[in-house]
């Protein structure tokens, strides 16, 4: 959650964390989905991609390389819709550089 908040990403829903059936109606509102653990959520993400054209990210942001890859995938997905809805694009490279500079 903190990483996405640092990037200015609003989280729509976290499923299954504290979710109920009422929350499921919000799933198609997301620009993309994140599946940090393939064992949980991959089938749902595949369904949402197939039925709603909603992409998903499978990379788990653990370690420097995977975290940087994850952030770049977030950037790619955000920038597919941000120009239309927010009239701008995002570049997270400086965030990646700063976070990995002292490691």
Curated annotation (Swiss-Prot):
Its EC number is 1.3.7.7. The keyword Flavoprotein does not apply. Keywords: 4Fe-4S, ATP-binding, Chlorophyll biosynthesis, Chloroplast, Iron, Iron-sulfur, Metal-binding, Nucleotide-binding, Oxidoreductase, Photosynthesis, Plastid. Binds 1 [4Fe-4S] cluster per heterodimer. The cluster is bound at the heterodimer interface by residues from both subunits. GO terms for cellular component: chloroplast. Pfam families: Oxidored_nitro. It is found in: Plastid, Chloroplast. It comes from the Eukaryota. GO terms for molecular function: 4 iron, 4 sulfur cluster binding; ATP binding; metal ion binding; oxidoreductase activity. Its main location: plastid. Pathway: Porphyrin-containing compound metabolism; chlorophyll biosynthesis (light-independent). It is an enzyme of class 1 (oxidoreductase). InterPro entries: ChlB/BchB/BchZ, Nase/OxRdtase_comp1. GO terms for biological process: light-independent chlorophyll biosynthetic process; photosynthesis. It catalyses: chlorophyllide a + oxidized 2[4Fe-4S]-[ferredoxin] + 2 ADP + 2 phosphate = protochlorophyllide a + reduced 2[4Fe-4S]-[ferredoxin] + 2 ATP + 2 H2O. Belongs to the ChlB/BchB/BchZ family. Component of the dark-operative protochlorophyllide reductase (DPOR) that uses Mg-ATP and reduced ferredoxin to reduce ring D of protochlorophyllide (Pchlide) to form chlorophyllide a (Chlide). This reaction is light-independent. The NB-protein (ChlN-ChlB) is the catalytic component of the complex. PANTHER family: LIGHT-INDEPENDENT PROTOCHLOROPHYLLIDE REDUCTASE SUBUNIT B (PTHR33712:SF7). This is Light-independent protochlorophyllide reductase subunit B. It comes from Equisetum arvense.
